[in-house]
Amino acid sequence: MKFYWSQIYSWLLRTPYRSLERAYRASKKIQHIKKNYIFYNKNIISSSRRSWQAIMLYINTNLNNCVFIIYWSLLEYRISLFFFDFIKTFVLIISNFFNSFFSNLISNNVIKQDLKEIKQMNKKLAWIEASLNDLDMWKYYYSFSFFSKEKQKTVETSLTFVDLKKNNVTTAAYESIGLVPRSITRTLSGFKTELTGQSTSLVLQDFQIARYQALASLQYMLFLLFIPWGFSSLLKIWFLEPWLKNWWNTYQYQIFLNSFQEELALKRLQQIEELVWLDKIMVNSLKEPQSQDLNIEIHQKTIQLVKIYNENSLNTLLHLLTDIVYVITLSAVFILGKQRLAILNSWIQELFYSLSDTMKAFSILLLTDLCIGFHSPHGWEIVIGSFLEHLGFAHNKHIISCFVSTFPVILDTVFKYWIFRHLNRISPSIVATYHTMNE
């Protein structure tokens, strides 16, 4: 046990050195990214727009992550250093009153050992400061040079290397739709690459871009799935459930949330009374059942039923609060991850457009039939009914029928507009295959 506590104590003492080492490694990574950028710089202008924007977004994201790690580690370093300096000063003051030998031991051994580490820490701090200053100058120089080069070609394809949030620049990691089909531009770009002898470097670039898009998209999808669910579940267990139980059982005297629950409880109570009478009659068929015993048993069953519906009302409120937290967390992930969302959008579009025309039409037909097919109203009724029961509302047939009769029609209109407006310009063959399979 003593060895375990000594390990924890030594780990805490090494916190300033560990955080500074993390910041130092991040500054080294910045230098490595800058060296790789020189390789991208040779072919970035001659590459396609998709490759160019994805490379710039990839490098800018990595640099921002490294800078965030550096500043966060330096903050941890300063806080931990201030805390341990305060402890050392306090120990030295106490040792002067109690034991002069303890004071000499600290001043002679510990401080001498700290001097060597302080020199190394100062060197690392100087390196980190120089790396950050050099990064600012480097960003300014390359953003200005690339903006001046691309401004002569087109304004739409200009992508500076400054912070995207400060300049409100929205980028996409895929090629936008233009007057000239993308297949023609890609063919001309590939032909130009073969003539200039840059195919090997561009293949490596495309592979790195594809790997980055896939990893970033999968990571963002995992974030969308697990972060809202995990945060809402932890908040439900640690805060919402204890607080809501205390408030509901202390300050709230109402058991039912709405009339729907009261009707269900009344029907259930009538069934319980009938079952109790039936059991007594079947057991004591020769004797007349006593009304006092029946009233006591019915009273006990009623108390159990009240506890059950009180717990159901509490769970309904708890589910509602948890769903609100889930929606807020999911919205925050969408807002804070706009760049990752653009990468995910480009990755999904690349996967979709890489399919054959038959598979594209099959995917569209499958999605439309699931949402707005002839059998979809029954599925929508089940979904809406389950959602209303989850929120504790009554199963209203009029509301469900109104929703089922209008919402699939809106979805059908949106699908048709998307096919006519967007898909027909990108690939008319997909639209022709879709209509053929649909007929």
UniProtKB/Swiss-Prot annotation:
Keywords in alphabetical order: Antiport, Chloroplast, Hydrogen ion transport, Ion transport, Membrane, Plastid, Plastid inner membrane, Potassium, Potassium transport, Transmembrane, Transmembrane helix, Transport
Reactions mediated catalytically: K(+)(in) + H(+)(out) = K(+)(out) + H(+)(in)
Compartments it resides in: Plastid, Chloroplast inner membrane
TM ranges: 55-75, 79-99, 220-240, 317-337, 364-384, 399-419
Coiled coil: none
GO CC terms of this entry: chloroplast inner membrane
Membrane topology: Multi-pass membrane protein
GO BP annotation list: potassium ion transport
Disulphide bridges: none
MF (Gene Ontology): antiporter activity; proton transmembrane transporter activity
Protein purpose: Contributes to K(+)/H(+) antiport activity by supporting proton efflux to control proton extrusion and homeostasis in chloroplasts in a light-dependent manner to modulate photosynthesis. Prevents excessive induction of non-photochemical quenching (NPQ) under continuous-light conditions. Indirectly promotes efficient inorganic carbon uptake into chloroplasts.
Similarity field: Belongs to the CemA family.
Protein name: Potassium/proton antiporter CemA
Native species: Physcomitrium patens
Gene: cemA
